[in-house]
């Protein structure tokens, strides 16, 4: 087993096939060999009767015996009439069974496939095949042929099969022609192929360096790529310069391409302050809608609650609390406003205020909906309020449009949420497009309370929604600033606020819940992190390793998450005979590993514990590998209350999560955090990263590394600018 070989033969039968991702198990009758071979791998649209040359590796399945795991497959059409009849009768064409297949081959022989594709009217000469049915068969066969052509084209450039299926869904029969006309379409958002790869494909096909397709693709790539940098738009001059630099051409040529895109593709150009901003159409629509809807909510009067102060006093008595002035103001403002922004750092009483607002709304007879951007944040929101909370995506009924490559939601203006009031926590994580989707799903009379910490890192997606709302001065807002006495006893909270004010955290050896261990060499630092997670914290604090999260500002370097994960996996989940594993590049996935999804994937299927089935695993979701099938082609991963199955071609989207970057930890809290303190890229050595990292720890934080880096980070309040027009549009809307 483990040997690589190449076999050639004819598909005898297809045992299993997943139409979503192409994963297939088939029996191959090998030329010159009596016993068939079981082949497993990504072989979409496989059918009995077709010929294949398969190159792969032998593995031993404990139940089914030897299997050839396909690495590459060359396919050919049936070579005789018997194979042709088997191929057509295999179910590859809906409605064509063995009997119809025999009749077709008997009539048209080896010319059958050409007749189906090019002369479908001749099929009507067979009894039972109408003109309509003949055209349906022809269309289905052309789609199948087209998919295979696209697969073969993309395979030459080592691009995955699921990409071929996505292109085929968009362009249908014209998919292959669309790729010939403009291979740069692969770099569009719904396909996500890196521009450099697409550019290499196009240039190898003979496209010129100044081809209009190339110029326009570079502009669109820069606009979509910079969404990941948080920009809603790009200034015209910066966009032109970036696109020209990307492909090495003069800016004049790119400027002409941009003008064409504005004319016919819908790229939007609008003045923002003193620059001309260029938007992708949907981002412009999102920005204008969010501004208009929020301004409308601010201006629209809401039903007032009689005797607000008396109600608040009753809530205080019932909950056994006494609100500070700002907390009382927040609860009262929630009663009188259609929209409210509640902000504050750790220990300032956001949770107490939030409970009060929820109770107030319930006493007003309002149906309250609690939401958060991530599953972990929603779970925590539910715990602190004692009510059910859910993710924004789940509440809105998120789905994915394969044709446009965009997320869609079932709930919108036509089918709004039933709630009278919606409360959203962790608003710093909400990007512009998610904000638009939420606002579209609210009834005109629905109240909205947004809660967050503006000093946390901004959303991964485009926009700086919380910051723009706060600094616009348009949205009624209460900023909680008082750190309460009980919270002041926590060194975690004291140090978080010190960092937020530009002061270095205190690095005393023992502060109860905040410890510092000085380790100047990378080797000793990594060794100490491993010891803390494997031995010291579990023994001294009674914590399981799963309750401890290692954070680092960076992925790269000796103290980055890649290096840390390698060491932590070896220490916490070493290989064992009874523990299945899968090699993927330079990574090994093993049963029991803590892993993280690194990009949004709307196609991964999952099943909840209650039997609910859905799809979509998102960037930052963390789970544990529960099972790896013996062939190494399927990984079962547990995400909180959901179980998802990954095929091998999706493993590139997974990473180890024993250690993660601070950015990936947004919206989460952990019982214990081990935070790496070591130099990294200048853009990461900033106050917001350190503040966010410290505030991830609930009970314990151990800072490991040099003693100079935390102070330097606290003193550096530089923030990467995000191009957004939301703040200005809000102000203009209220003018």
Segments from the language model and where they lie:
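Accessory, non-ATPase domains that flank or precede helicase/AAA+ motor cores in DNA-metabolism machines
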Residues: 1-310, 316
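A generic structural signal for residues embedded in beta-strands
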Residues: 14, 54, 597, 625-628, ...
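Short, well-ordered loop/turn sites that connect or cap secondary structure elements
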Residues: 46-48, 416, 589, 617
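Loop/turn positions that initiate beta-strands
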Residues: 49-51, 592, 620
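ASCE P-loop NTPase helicase motor core
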Residues: 233, 328-331, 336-510
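Conserved pre-motif I regulatory segment
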Residues: 311-338
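Conserved helicase motor core of P-loop NTPases
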Residues: 454-615, 626
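C-terminal accessory regions
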Residues: 501, 609, 619-735
């Amino acid at each position: 087993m483990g040997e690589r070989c190449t076999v050639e033969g004819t598909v005898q039968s297809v045992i299993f096939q997943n139409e979503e991702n192409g994963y297939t198990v088939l029996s191959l009758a090998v030329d010159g060999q009596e016993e068939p071979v079981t082949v497993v791998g990504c072989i979409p649209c496989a059918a009995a009767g077709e010929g294949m040359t398969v190159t792969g590796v032998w593995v031993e399945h404990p139940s089914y015996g030897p299997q050839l795991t396909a690495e590459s497959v060359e396919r050919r059409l049936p070579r005789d009439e018997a194979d042709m009849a088997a191929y057509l009768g295999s179910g590859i064409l809906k409605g064509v069974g063995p009997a119809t297949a025999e009749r077709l081959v008997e009539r048209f022989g080896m010319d059958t496939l050409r007749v189906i594709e090019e002369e479908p009217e001749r099929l009507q000469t067979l009894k039972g095949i109408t003109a309509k049915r003949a055209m349906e068969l022809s269309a289905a066969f052309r789609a199948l042929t087209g998919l295979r052509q696209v697969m073969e084209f993309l395979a030459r450039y080592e691009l995955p099969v699921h990409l071929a299926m996505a292109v085929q869904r968009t362009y249908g029969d014209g998919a292959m022609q669309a790729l010939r006309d403009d291979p740069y379409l692969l770099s569009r958002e719904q396909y996500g192929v890196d521009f450099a790869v697409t550019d290499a494909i196009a240039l190898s096909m003979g496209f010129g360096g100044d081809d209009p397709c190339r110029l326009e693709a570079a502009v669109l790539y820069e606009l979509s790529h910079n969404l990941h940098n948080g920009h809603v738009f790009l200034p015209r001059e910066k966009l032109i310069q970036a696109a020209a630099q990307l492909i090495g051409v003069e800016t004049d040529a790119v400027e002409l391409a941009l003008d064409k895109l504005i004319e016919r593709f819908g790229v939007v150009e609008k003045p923002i302050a003193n620059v001309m901003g260029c938007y992708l159409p949907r981002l412009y629509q999102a920005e204008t809608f969010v501004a208009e809807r929020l301004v409308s909510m601010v201006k629209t009067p809401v039903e007032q609650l009689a005797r607000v102060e008396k109600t608040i006093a009753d809530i205080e008595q019932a909950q056994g609390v006494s609100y500070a002035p700002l907390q009382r103001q927040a609860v009262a403002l929630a009663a009188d406003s259609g929209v409210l922004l509640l902000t504050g750092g750790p220990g300032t009483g956001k949770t107490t205020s939030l409970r009060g607002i929820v109770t107030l709304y319930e006493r007003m007879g309002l149906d309250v909906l609690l939401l958060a951007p991530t599953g972990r944040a929603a779970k925590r929101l539910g715990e602190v309020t004692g009510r059910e909370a859910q993710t924004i995506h789940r509440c809105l009924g998120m789905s994915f449009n394969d044709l446009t490559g965009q997320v869609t939601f079932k709930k919108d203006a036509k089918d709004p949420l039933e709630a009278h009031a919606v409360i959203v926590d962790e608003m710093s994580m909400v990007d512009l497009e998610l904000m638009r989707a939420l606002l579209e799903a609210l009834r005109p009379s629905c109240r909205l309370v947004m809660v967050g910490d503006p000093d946390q890192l901004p959303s991964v997606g485009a926009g700086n929604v919380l910051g723009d709302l706060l600094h616009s001065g348009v949205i009624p807002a209460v900023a909680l600033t008082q750190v309460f006495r009980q919270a002041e006893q926590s060194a975690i909270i004291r140090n978080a606020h010190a960092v937020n004010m530009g002061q270095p955290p205190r690095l005393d050896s023992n502060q109860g819940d905040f410890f510092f261990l000085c380790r100047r060499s990378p080797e000793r630092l990594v060794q100490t992190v491993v010891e803390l997670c494997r031995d010291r914290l579990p023994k001294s604090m009674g914590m399981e390793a799963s309750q401890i999260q290692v954070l680092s500002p960076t992925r790269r370097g000796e103290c980055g998450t890649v290096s840390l994960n390698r060491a932590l996996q070896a220490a916490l989940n070493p290989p064992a005979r009874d523990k299945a594993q899968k090699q993927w590049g330079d990574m090994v996935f093993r049963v029991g590993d803590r892993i993280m999804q690194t990009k949004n994937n709307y196609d991964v299927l999952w099943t909840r514990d209650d039997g609910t089935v859905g799809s979509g695993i998102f960037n930052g979701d963390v789970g544990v590998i529960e099972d790896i099938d013996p062939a190494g082609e399927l990984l079962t991963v547990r995400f909180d209350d959901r179980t998802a199955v990954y095929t091998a071609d999706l493993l590139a989207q997974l990473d180890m999560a024993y250690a993660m970057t601070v950015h990936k930890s947004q919206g989460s809290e952990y019982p214990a955090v081990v935070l790496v303190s070591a130099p990294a890229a200048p853009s990461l050595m900033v106050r917001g990263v350190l503040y966010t990292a410290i505030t991830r720890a609930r009970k314990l934080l151990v800072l490991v590394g040099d003693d100079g880096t935390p102070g330097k980070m606290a003193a550096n309040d530089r923030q990467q600018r995000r191009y957004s027009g939301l703040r200005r549009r809000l102000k203009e809307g209220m003018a």
